[in-house]
């Protein structure tokens, strides 16, 4: 069997002050990190560029293949600054939101979206800091929005604003986001997590911009965190490379009790479409302060894996928490334990029901998955140039690892989020005989012993995107 039992569920870690030095990055990679997330809601290009450079150095030093995700700020609304860095709201207090650039207080403060007064109506709620403070709109006077605080609460500078039930008219791609995406193209990031995607066109706008900047192959993962995004999920999945279920803002925009249902629905839809899905936000939130998670957090991570998520994500836990390494190790242990108990036969049957078996490449991958289950093979070795074969295999969730040899370092990184896939950089082969010989070498390097069986699959050497053969091989 494979020498180290491989974690199939991938882990995304947000990197910040608690984790951005070289030694801590090495620890996080050893603990199970697959993708580094850079949150462009905070920090500048110098800081993010430094993180990316350090990760590349670490990858080179220790032979890891951790990919880079750029997470956009998105068309979010934030408060301005407050005198003293924070303000205290009192229930029943009148609070005025103004487009004027001021250093504010609970009585009067500014926000980043200057035309909110055009969109809101009396009776709407404006939620501040993930809903910690609720402001009920009383009336709009000129460009000022007069509200009444529904509860007490403290709010620090530049906290997020949500306006559930109100359709906001701002442009999806701000100048900041455009510049950030161009920076990401220059930095060769592998994934873009696009915040507050509301419709299909938002995804297409990002894809157009990155293509114009010479990087059409960067994978775009819309974050579903508002009502419109949920309503338009089918058309968004159609054009996306994957989805992130961003439960923080989503849980403010919709009733909290709806979030688990939405999470399950989106994961199911992505699984059926063969698209990556990441479950994110507050998964191990208490580990920002504590070395061990709550039992509820363990169950949350476990249930996302049972639901079929490809990846699970850490935010503040790894970016600014006291225990970033412990948080990754905790996720890793949960993933291993749950993966041991998955009903792989049932998952395979469900995947086959939703597969396009009129497609020859899909039919071969389906056959590989069925043979792997029936013969209890030790691994699937899926040779791939673009990653297409390995991605197809991933949707069938085989019990054994999918080892994906590829001559492309870019493909290695882009497979970092696919469930069960272990990408391996290898030399290019032009013949089937050469591929089979290489499969033997790769199998042994991954701890598969003589006498064990693997399935070798892939496309015609030199032809991208197709899966055209499978062969059961006994390791010699």
Language model: regions and residue ranges:
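Non-catalytic helical/linker scaffolds that mediate oligomerization, partner binding
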Residues: 1-476
